[in-house]
Amino acid sequence: MFILYLVFMLGIGIWFFVRSKNAGEKDYFLGGREMGAWVSGLSAGASDMSAWVLMGMPASIYAYGMGKAWIPVGLFIGYSLSWIFIAPRLRSFSIVCGDSITIPQYLTNRFKASSRALQIISAVIFLVAYTVYSASSIKACGTLFETVLGIPAQIAMYAAAVIIVGYTFLGGFNAVCWTDFFQGLLMLGSLFAAPIVALCMMQKSGTTAGTLPAGYWNMMTSWQDILSGLGWGLGYAGMPHIIIRFMSVKSDKELKKAAKVGIGWTFFILMFAVLVSVVAHLFLGDGQESSTIFIAIVRRIFTGPWLGLISGLLLSAILAGAMSTADSQLLAASSAFASDVYKPVIRKGQSTDKEMLWVGRIVVLVIAAAALLIASNPGSGTIMSLVENAWGIFGASFGPVIVLSLFWRGFTFSGAAAGIVAGAAVDVLWLVLFKSTGVYEIVPGFAAGLLAAVIASKCSSAESRETAAALFDQCIAYKD
């Protein structure tokens, strides 16, 4: 079943490669801005949640109780607000601002800046953070194959990386979005089926394998849990591989439909992920390896030759989660280097579309190789910690800047540069020096980025403020 699933994903990449031999840079990195509501909505959700929603998050709540449920609460609030407020403006602003196809390109064009400093700074952060983020997805694939099939994790990670790189390398944005569409459906179906069937089996037998620990339902465990959990929602405004979907939708009408699809999918995926952690205590008992509770539930429910096929299909959801996020991250990072460093800085704007496609593909290979090295390192940390670190630096560095660029006329180029640098620096410093406080680094990082962006903008010249304000008004006036 796993093999069939992987072949299907690779087939999508080959299909779009054959169809898009004459495609340009905009088609490869943004789907030509022709994405529909269902594909955009589901692919945004699937690229967001990753295998973490099937392994990392249920594991955290299973191990520590409902105090960690503030994470899905924060995620749902942040995701919903991003679709409602950020998506419509980012789509129209990116079109008016030079038909931008990447986030760094949009930020540079938003201020009519001649300097490429923003693009270069952003691209560097992209490359570093996405390498770490992609490592978490590759690591999840290794855990799955080692637990279910007994295949050594190292071999499994190499195989998964080859498949992910294969269809991303070949098909670009269209292949990534369409594979994410199918993977989003599989993830939701699997997270629904596993806990519900387990509950039905326990109700039928009248017995449970364990009980919930004392205080499990207590969500008011500490102010750090509440603040840090809700702080996860701050990340959405600055998550390039997610918000790039907003820019790719073909019309404002389709965007409104996509928002409903994306928000609805996310609500149910988070709700069932929390349910998995509760059911695991009752159905499996205590003492389970927390990161594999979803795998354990599925394997216990569906046993036997034919039911084993169903088990394989449901467990493919972990592959779906890992692949749907890794492919989006690889493409976002490669587009940042190709469009924001190689084309304007190295080639001085003289590169051809074909050249840009191949540069992007080569960068996909390089980042995937680096991510594989991190994932293969036994000291790289858990899936949860890898996601947490990458999510934090993106949210802290780009979140305030994206929000201000869309909602403040007085925001300037200097403010954007200061916000990105300050947000990233404070996020990393907090992680290194103050992790013991229990406060997620995205919270102080976001606050620092916001403050620096506002102060630097206020200190900018009157001319730069007027230029930014004039373009802001043009963006607001844009209609399909």
Per-region residue spans from a language model:
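Membrane-embedded helix-loop-helix hairpins and adjacent transmembrane boundary segments
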Residues: M1-D480
